[in-house]
Every structure is written in structure tokens, then in C-alpha cells.
Design a protein with these regions (language model features):
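Signature of the chorismate-utilizing enzyme
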Residues: 1-177
């Protein structure tokens, strides 16, 4: 199997503590084979699917599956919980400054042959995140018990390009793991 970089280049970048993307791309004209692969992958814990739907179309250019996050960040009540491969750390900090630092440190060079979403932080920001910015009374009962913010960093992505009929198998290698 041919990958996008040599072992020598990989080791050199790894020693420099540089985030890297390893990938393999294949032509796949039969979308039903891709759908079956997705059904299998989506059974994994903490996996997700995105469709890049535009202008009311049924299917957009890219179908993206992410799985196997190495880190998951939950923010709730000014506490960041970091799940680092099963090890949970609680960090009492300013959540907005922490998020800003996290996003600024998330630098990874995406090869031109790949879509820009080949490496990502994925998750949600709840409506209650506004309370970290403005002083708004919190009179509502918290009956959902979900974090104000949840972000994960998937190690593995499978991206199908519906236009070029190409599937990309991607492994993100992060220097801090």
C-alpha cells in the first residue's frame, strides 16, 4: 500500500514534534460500497458523519466520517475536562482563553490532494456558552446535563469526494500524543 510520505520524512517530522497527516486515496465509483463502509465505521464510539450539503441538494460534494478521537474536551461551569485516551484531567480555567489557545495550537499542514477538512476539531457550542461572555442570569433548570462545549479530535477520517468519486483514508498523527 502506497502512502503519501516516506517513513524517513515521517520520522523527521515526528522528531520535530510536527503534527502530520498520513493518507491513502482510492477511486471508488460505487457509492453503495462507500455506504456500507460508513455503516460499519459509525458503529464506533464517538464517531460522526457530516454531509457537505449545499443549496438543498440531497448529497453534497463530501461525505465525512470521523472516529477514534485521541482527545475530547468538555467545558461546563468554568471547568475543562480533558479526556486524553481515557485519562480524565479537570482544569479550572477561563474556558474562552483555553479554547483560543487550543485552536491556535491546532496547526496541521493539509496536503493539497486532500480536502481542507482532513484534520479537524469537531463538536458543538451550546447556547449557554454566552454566559462565559456576558453576565446573564441562569434561572433555567439544567435538565439535559450536557457540557456547554464539547470538542473532539478524531485521529481517523474517511472522506468520500462525491464529485471525483474518490475515497480518502486519513490518519492524523499529533505531536502531543
Amino acid at each position: 500500500m502506497r502512502l503519501n510520505k516516506s517513513l524517513h520524512d515521517f520520522k523527521k517530522n515526528h522528531l520535530r514534534k510536527k503534527n502530520q497527516v498520513i493518507f491513502r486515496s482510492l477511486h471508488c465509483k460505487n457509492y453503495y460500497k462507500v455506504e456500507n463502509l460508513y455503516k460499519f465505521l459509525l458503529a464506533e464510539k464517538n464517531s460522526f458523519i457530516f454531509e457537505s450539503v449545499e443549496k438543498g441538494t440531497t448529497r453534497g460534494r463530501y461525505t465525512i466520517i470521523g472516529l477514534d478521537p485521541d482527545k475530547i474536551w468538555d467545558i461546563r461551569n468554568n471547568v475543562v475536562s480533558l479526556d486524553n485516551n481515557g485519562k480524565i484531567d479537570k482544569i479550572k480555567t477561563n474556558p474562552l482563553k483555553y479554547l483560543n489557545k487550543l485552536i491556535n495550537e491546532f496547526k496541521i499542514e493539509i496536503p493539497r490532494k486532500l480536502p481542507s477538512m482532513a484534520s479537524m476539531l469537531v463538536g458543538y457550542f451550546s447556547y449557554d456558552i454566552i454566559r462565559y461572555i456576558e453576565k446573564i442570569p441562569n434561572r433555567c433548570k439544567d435538565d439535559l446535563k450536557i457540557p456547554d462545549v464539547r470538542l473532539s479530535r478524531p485521529r481517523n477520517l474517511v472522506i468520500y469526494d462525491n464529485l471525483k468519486k474518490k475515497i480518502h483514508y486519513i490518519e492524523n498523527i499529533y505531536a502531543d500524543t
